[in-house]
Amino acid sequence: MKWANLLFTSLLFLSSNAIASGVGFTQITLTDDPKRPLNTAIWYPTQEVSNTTLIGDNPAFVGTKIIKDAQIQSSTFPVVLLSHGYRGNWRNQNWLATEIAKRGYIVAAADHPGTTTFDHSLKQAAKWWERPRDMSRILDHLLTSARWKQHVNADNVTAIGHSLGGWTVMQLAGAKVDRQTFKSRCLIYPNPRTCGLAEELGLAKVQAHEPSSKDLSDPRIKRVVTLDLGLAGSFSINSLNDITVPTLILAAGIDIGDLPQALESGYIAEHIPLYSRRYKVYENATHFSFIQDCKQGAEVILEDEVPGDGIICKDGVGTSREELHQLILNDIVSFLNR
């Protein structure tokens, strides 16, 4: 019943706040840390409607229509920060970013160095603490850049992450990495996918230049949303118990073999105080139902490129990814409007 009420609220929100005529889009590189430049994509409301182009579109995946480098609409807008999964990129949640921007948000996402499609640097990947810092750096830019600062509502900032991105945004909310907890969990649940990444992601042992404090929270983040997150077992239970930031936990009901939601999303839902979180499982969704939609024939294309990658296009029987995306979008917009 709570979710039904929230959905009704969201429909009212959509009708009263869908003020943008189009979605503007731009890409920048953040160089405030020269050792970790951030390729960043930004979607935003615009009154412009002409000269649309497709982004994130290729033979396998469906893109979205945007207006490149359009003038931002004259107003202030809440902010959503997006974090992609392991070896993903901003295009994975392009569908979500575009829809949220249509509804009056500035949305920004970076390709995390070391764990993105186009950068597999082991040195960068092992700097696990830099992922949440990447998100804080993006917000710093939006709040200080001449182009954006007058358009940002600094009191309304949400962070959303898929898979490893969900793990990233949980740290912004106050979750703290604890190696002993992770080691113990891996002895009980030796998942080769999550436990097998411990070395690469710098979680097996203390890294050079690792911050002494595991608290990477950012008080400017007012809400977080996780989309079938992974590596939840690396968080200390005490830190999850202490989270007060409103948290929406969305999970895939179909286990494709490496991220069972009961041990990942379910773990954080179990330990975050009930008053701080909402938890929903989409029974017909897989881990990849949260990324962009596949075109007809995409499964064959992906399988030919990398055997086994065809699974990226699989959803539950009798359910389309487009339908799942609409459900996910409705739930996220409802949460944003709380």
Language-model regions, residue ranges each:
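Domain-level recognition of soluble alpha/beta enzyme cores
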Residues: A20-L81, Q261, A298
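Short beta-strand/loop motif that positions the catalytic acidic residue
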Residues: I243, I249-A251
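Catalytic nucleophile-loop/oxyanion-hole region of alpha/beta-hydrolase
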Residues: R87-E99, T116-R137
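Alpha/beta-hydrolase active-site loop
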Residues: Q124-Q150, A154, W167, Q171, ...
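Catalytic active-site module of serine/aspartate enzymes centered on a nucleophile-bearing elbow/loop
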Residues: Q296-R338
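Short beta-strand immediately N-terminal to the catalytic nucleophile in serine-hydrolase-like folds
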Residues: A159-G161
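The conserved beta1-alpha1 loop
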Residues: P78-G85, D111, A251-A252
